[in-house]
């Protein structure tokens, strides 16, 4: 009788383990396209990612680089004070997007240009994403009073 209970307990534990591993694998598989790693411009220039890799880049829109093209096409450079990466974007920019302001873009780095599929700007006059602040502090550009 005891061995039957013990065997049943082992079966339940084994089934629970298989279910846990299976659900973890399914969650990881489902999220593979939803995870975008953040990189600063310096990191992108040091180790350029593959053209197929989607990631986020953040920093300050470099002064004097914002160029509006035909329609909704925009070109600018994003910098963290240590390096600058050219960015292209086709779409409507956020209202608070301007030079010398923080931004985060999602896209791919192809042939030396970050091709953004999404651009986010700070949402008020004092906010800057934590990743951008950390990257700017690392380069010695960020000061606490900066917005």
UniProtKB/Swiss-Prot annotation:
All ranges on the Cytoplasmic side of the membrane: 1-9
Annotated InterPro entries: CcmE, CcmE-like_sf, NA-bd_OB-fold
SUPFAM superfamilies linked: Heme chaperone CcmE (SSF82093)
Keyword annotations from UniProtKB, A to Z: Cell inner membrane, Cell membrane, Cytochrome c-type biogenesis, Heme, Iron, Membrane, Metal-binding, Signal-anchor, Transmembrane, Transmembrane helix
Keyword Transmembrane helix: yes
Subcellular location, record wording: Cell inner membrane
Positions on the Periplasmic side per record topology: 31-147
GO terms of molecular function: heme binding; metal ion binding
Topology versus the membrane: Single-pass type II membrane protein
Cellular compartments per GO CC: plasma membrane
Transmembrane segments annotated in the record for this chain: 10-30
Residues noted as binding heme in the record, renumbered to the chain: 123, 127
GO biological process: cytochrome complex assembly
Purpose of the protein: Heme chaperone required for the biogenesis of c-type cytochromes. Transiently binds heme delivered by CcmC and transfers the heme to apo-cytochromes in a process facilitated by CcmF and CcmH.
Similarity section: Belongs to the CcmE/CycJ family.
Protein name: Cytochrome c-type biogenesis protein CcmE
């Amino acid at each position: 009788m005891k061995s039957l209970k013990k065997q049943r307990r082992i079966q339940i534990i084994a089934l629970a383990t298989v279910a846990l591993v299976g659900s973890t694998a399914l969650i990881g598989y489902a999220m593979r396209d939803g995870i975008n790693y953040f990189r600063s411009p310096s990191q992108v220039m040091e180790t350029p990612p593959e053209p197929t890799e989607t990631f986020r880049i953040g920093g300050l829109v470099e002064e004097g680089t914002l160029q509006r093209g035909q329609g909704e096409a925009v070109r600018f450079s994003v910098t963290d004070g240590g390096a600058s990466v050219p960015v292209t974007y086709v779409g409507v920019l956020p209202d608070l997007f301007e030079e010398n302001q923080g931004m985060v873009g999602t896209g791919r780095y192809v042939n030396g240009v970050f091709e953004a599929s999404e651009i986010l700007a700070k949402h008020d006059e004092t906010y800057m994403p934590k990743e951008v602040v950390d990257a700017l502090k690392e380069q010695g550009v960020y000061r606490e009073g900066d917005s």
